[in-house]
Amino acid sequence: MATTTKVWRNPSYLQSSTGIFLFFCSWGIWWSFFQRWLNSMGLNGAKVGTIYSINSLATLILMFGYGLIQDNLGLKRRLVLVISAIAALVGPFVQFVYAPLMRTNMMAAALVGSVVLSAGFMAGCSLIEPVTERYSRRFNLEYGQSRAWGSFGYAIVALVAGFVFNINPMINFWLGSAFGVGMLIVYLTWYPAEQREALKEAADPNAAPTNPTIKDMLGVLKMPTLWVLIVFMLLTNTFYTVFDQQMFPTYYASLFPNEATGNAVYGTLNSVQVFCESAMMGVVPIIMRKVGVRNALLLGSTVMFLRIGLCGIFHDPVSISIVKMFHAIEVPLFCLPAFRYFTLHFNPKLSATLYMVGFQIASQIGQVVFSTPLGMLHDRMGDRTTFLTISAIVLAATVYGFFVIKRDDEQVDGDPFIRDSKKLPSLATDEAILSADSEDM
């Protein structure tokens, strides 16, 4: 209880949690039905795959730039403010630019949309999360607790997204703008005293440099150990978008008598799943302390293999809804251990760049590679074959990861991680042992 009270009294926790909450509200209200919206615009699976591939390519380029710039900015919010401004404008952009262009020239719309949507959301997510994680390390927070508010925000908007989509899909995008305005206000005006002091210290010309150099940041690409993890992420986390965003919504809606019912039930299910995901953000750090960072990552890929594979086996709404709930533990098992893996085995000052390259950019490369071919496979072979193919790829990646992902006590170049089972006995335990020994004597 005391720990909980202390967290709620931490102004940086309140600020960063509110910011990431509003970001995921702004994104989730339309992103959860983006694939359904593209279908409503007359695009088939292959064309939807092309849209996702182009988005991923733009996201890939932007994310690497974001990582380099933010690691150099440290705690400054300049890039976060740019993302907030784009989020605030997503409604007008889709209403007056993206949708009209999509009806006349799909490729032009895909190119323009990839820049705006990636800059504000897909690549933006990969900036907001490292910034929140950096605040957590600097101001004595638990990153998982702040990140849970992002999932909570996504869950809230997912609860209503399906119903709003059935009324008019454009409302989803305009609600995204409303949340974006709130996000912009938070990051523009809310500076807790400890953050102002930290920024003042960083601006002192006599202070020792704490931010990595460009050479340091580009040097991450020369790390063989990073490329080992990139391959693992490329063959696992990639499918969060390829499967869950590009294929699953339409598949799930098809299990119901009509499209409107499917959309409404999917929105509700998605909300329940993300609510549980939010809760699991607080549970996964406990799991990590029990099983370790490496094993938590492998557990995440195992859950993904089972979830996608079972979607290719079951074909009724109840079973698929139960399988969908596996997602609630899967996302935290990828997100939180990935961050901790980077700060464990690499220089923590490079956390934003490492997260961009090793986690997010790897996933985006996978989406560029897999989105269109799997979209074509889905059009030709249907749900079952496509889902089982993806599941087999994830299984192969899990086996690969078992042999190549480093143990928690191997090549520790960052902040050490000690599992609960390996921690030294506490002082109280030591005193009890000494007392027992004295009585025996």
Which residues are covered by each model-predicted region?
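Helix-to-loop junctions at the C-terminal end of transmembrane segments
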Residues: I61-L75, F165, A279-V293, H378-D379
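Juxtamembrane intracellular "pre-TM" segments in multi-pass secondary transporters
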Residues: M1-N10, Y191-I230, S254-P257, R419-E431
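A membrane-interface helix-boundary motif in multi-pass transporters
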Residues: F163-G180, M376-V394
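Cytoplasmic helix-loop-helix junction between adjacent transmembrane helices
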Residues: G113-G150
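Multi-pass alpha-helical transporter architecture, strongest
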Residues: R9, G65, F93-A99, G180-Q195, ...
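Helix-loop boundary and gating motifs at the non-cytosolic
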Residues: T3-T59, T225-M233, N237-P257, C335
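C-terminal ends and interior cores of transmembrane alpha-helices
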Residues: A85-R103, V303-H315, F402
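Interfacial helix-cap and linker-helix signal at transmembrane-aqueous boundaries
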Residues: L38-N39, I69-D71, A148, F163-N166, ...
